[in-house]
Amino acid sequence: MKKILCGLIVVGMISGCSDPILQNESEKPEPEKAFALVDVMSGNAVLEDWHENNVITRVIWQKLKLSEACGEKYPALLDAFEKYNEESLTEAKAQMYELTPLAKEMEGEEYNPVYCGAEAKLYLQRADNHIVSFFEGVETYTGGIHPDYVVNGRNYSPETGAEVKLTEVLTDTKDLPSILEKKITEKYPGVTFFELEDTFSKYKPEEFTWTADYQGITFWFSPYEIAAYAVGTLSAKIWFDEYPELFNKAYVEAPSDYVMTLPVGHEIEFDLEGDGVKDTIYTEKRLDQYGSYNMLSVTVNGKTGTDEINYAYDFDVYLVHMDDKNYIYSDSTSDNDYHMFCTWDINGDTPKITQELYGTEMDYHFVEEGYETGTVYKQAFNHPESFVLETRFDILGTRGATAAYQVSKTDGTPEMKDGVYTFNYGHEVTTSIPLEAELLPDMEKTELPVGTSLTPYQTDGKSYVDLKTKEEQIVRLAIDESDWPRKVNGIPEDECFENLMYAG
């Protein structure tokens, strides 16, 4: 069950629009501009075509949005995102028009009814007042041995909403072909390439695919672009500290702690310890032994850790840099939209899971965007000191509750800021016996008569639950959720309340 603010479909958020920053009318950001993060939201929209009770074509793409505060601060960026959404919808409809006839001609399999489709997925690399940068992977399947796959870089200026040009980030591009040729051949010594430097010299700056993070810019090359399809997507990173004279200083500025979304199935380069040694991180989905679910595998500098217990269908994966240490957060989606939020420690020899938060995911909101339509926008956080997680609880029924978190400086796990969860969805409850309670804030003893309607409000998740009465008073009940059935004041909860509803 999903909480509703008002409207349907999945997505992501960030933090930093509460404090004013100096506005600059110049197209190029100036180095002295105060640094601030930008609250970006992104997520999935879907079109489907059915034939004989089966989906035969599906197109998935992602929509972009700003938080309300950032939308007011960066109206041009908000307009750019809305334009992107409109263009993406138009493209999705065109793909459906092209793919559906192909799908109808194919002989499908009984247990694999989706014959043609396309999916575009965005991974936020950086979002601040200088640049908002996404890596985008687009996969299209029209039959045959393998799908087509291309990668894009989408880079926006928050102030103007315009595309950030490569020539705005680099002060000079004349040596770019030779730099890229050197980096690519050194990184992939066993690969046979097309004539790289000659190929790159024919590229105009705007023809390169690139993204920006807090340590440099990465150039991406789709399959077939500079090598055979089987080689896959290739990349080369030019580091800020490696070619300092090459970069506009405004884009070099970085916070000491940050988060970026990892593109699953792609290797990224990062200097994890700030020691000048370039590290590699690779995350991928691996099928379980039955081929039904996926397992997440994390490889850092050739050492691999795999979660072989918590199977899922999909994962959102984040690199967290905090106090010169590094962690990976994974938010997995499994059956019945059940989530698992895991912390991976990657500071040692082999990546390993150090914490599992069951039923927990990044916070989300359903925003109405038209008559009976809308999008679920999900936080794609980039601020280790401030983010929100939602946890599914089985307390007086199944319900979701959110809490504010920060990354622990001790072990890198999500750390609650105030120890309180606030419920955001779930049904009202009605007492079936008189119940002793405490009336907040003075903790006065009171008794709730039979037939009292209450709305669960807050909990610590283990010892108490606060509920609101029809008169907006808050009462506290003692709970014990260590076993089934849950107990209220030491009494089985189904004896205390009528018709408690739990998810199956």
Residue ranges, per PLM feature:
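Positively charged n-region of N-terminal signal peptides that target proteins for export
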Residues: 1-8
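Compositionally biased intrinsically disordered regions enriched in Thr/Gly
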Residues: 18-273, 282, 286-287, 293, ...
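Acidic, small-residue rich beta-repeat scaffolds with periodic aromatic anchors
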Residues: 30, 34-44, 212-265, 346-504
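Short, hydrophobic/aromatic-rich segments at coil-to-beta transitions
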Residues: 129-135, 324-329, 384-388
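Hydrophobic beta-strand positions in blades of beta-propellers and related beta-sheet-rich domains
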Residues: 153, 291-300, 341-343, 402-404
